[in-house]
Amino acid sequence: MKNYKKTYFDYTTKDFVSMVQEPGGKKLGNCLYCYKPLTESGVDFHTACNKRFFGQLYTPTLDYSFDDLEALASKVVSSHMAVTGVQPKLSLSLHRKQDKNRVKKLTIVGLYGDYILKPPTAHYKELPEVEDATLHMADVCGIAAVPHSLVKLTDGTRCYITKRIDRTRNGKLGMEDMCQLAERLTEDKYKGSHEQVAKLVLKYSSNPLFDVTNFWEQVLLSYFTGNADMHLKNFSLVENAMGTYSLSPAYDLVNTALVNPADT
């Protein structure tokens, strides 16, 4: 982890949002992926950032409004095809059966998509920006994190989007969170400890010393960014191409001190 000149982050939620938004709440002037200034008008991503995150030169369309997502999310949950977790999530995939010259669409597909979309909620309207900014801090610190970005709906609402790391062109990869490895029920995810997670990493990882070091870096980052929600399901071992398991990149990092100051 890189050295910090400051060891304490004293940010407000508005500070986090301002990292990806121009003053006054006007049109985004920075790339939703890398946060650097855009060089073209009418776009939300650099061409290189589109290629890096979506695998194509243009931003795929996401033809849903916030109200559309709320209605669709209810249908997905009732059909038992929702992505697991407390925060509302929708599974997306690029619609590839289109004319090669047309911009591809991101569509909701149930469980087996390539991306996970997290819209804001009524109680935590700026949660997508906070989660993406927290993971961006991991990137800046040199800590491996899942591919992530912000993306806009048709009504301008920003959502958090991440690329699934347990999916490849060849199929699904195994991914076991620490709740599963500790043989605990999901409702017991808060009944563990970082010491227990470290021991599980040492026991099951194919590269234990390297991975346990990376694990403690994630713990330190969580402390510095005010993240009080790193339970057993927020650390996982993921299968690689050789069939062995290693610590997954950081995911579900949220500055809970900003989102819910009472939970600190």
Predicted regions located by residue number:
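Short beta-alpha connecting loops at secondary-structure transitions
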Residues: 262-264
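Acidic surface patches and DE-rich sequence motifs
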Residues: 10, 153-154, 240
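Conserved ATP-binding subdomain of kinase catalytic cores across diverse folds
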Residues: 66-189
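Conserved kinase catalytic-core segment
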Residues: 122-139, 193-259
